[in-house]
């Protein structure tokens, strides 16, 4: 019997909503059975040898173009984290000599664009004006460059690293896209066509690192100048990291079962999908604890979201919100049984996380965690009031609430404490008001979510989303509203790009995690509700990332 049905405190005459979510497709016993052969000292020795060979490549490669390409390939293969010092040394040197008037760079669109993208990606402040030599006196893109497809592709990717107030590359992007699409339709170069089509679907800057690595490893095999050592390192590293992720997933799955939340019939049992979010945000194997905690947070928040969105009455939701604000188990008897289960699961898990941080870092963070949960529950309650009062907010009013109900601000505040040591007073002060490095990715998640899920959610009778609010504000068509949301996503990314090089109390690692969260949302909702409906493309991605190792030929 499900917990919500096992209580005399619930009035059986209440008519409750149902979202008819399908049950999880990932069986507990199946998850616990996951095992990898890619563990142990033999594989560690093998990968250390390969890393040594690649390190030697950094010392041997002196051609500036080859240096850039090596960094780019290592990043796309998902193994650049092994070579951070070597990459930093090369990019630091390139930044120091960036204005030296390199003739090769001025003449090569490809070299200029790749260097610009890599430097911007790694936080170096280089000007967009470096591309002016590729425009004529009328400020139009020089036509002869249209035959340079690799250069055009590199320019397209570079254009997504612009910041607020920059428009040179943005203005030429439509022109570049037009020519790249024509190339795909006409060319017989299979590898380059594959790369162009992939980029046009979603730019590299917006892609999830781990998922991109899995895709690029297969694509790289078809490249004429493929380096066998790089490929071997990437394949082995992917499988070894997958083994770590499997152990993480198994532990999170055991925790989830212990909470009993998976037995709530109205809520989504999406522990695997939440682990996919966590792995997209924090990929590297050494961050196992942080990844597991992020997945647990996501699973809790998915359930609480369903309480407010689907099952709870307005009176019950007000009681639950008050309980979270008080953060006190003594008032739990006022809650129906199913909400007691929910509250205790949140209370115990969050207090344990705070205790871990106190032990490891000497900082009592429970007040910040309590604030995060109170903020999101109050915002959930506001949306519930909109629903019960059949109220359609303006787009501005909607977004002021809905960026919080993505749960991303709450998750990222927790994540800061997981990932950071030492924790600084300056950062704590900033977290109180949700700085832009937290706020902006949350907006992207909200807009991506609405683009992917609003149609299905409206059919279930849910609140209007950003698309419908904009249509109501402006009398726009649905397609016009969708285009506007995509525009807002693009504008927000430009602001994030600037935030990541601005002076900040937050580490580069934390900033990267905040961007990764935005990236996960764009693939999770790219073709619909990848979080709520786990048996489509999400299933294939879970299979590729956590279950199926890359086949490696035995020597």
Which residues are covered by each model-predicted region?
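Terpene synthase/cyclase
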Residues: 1-555
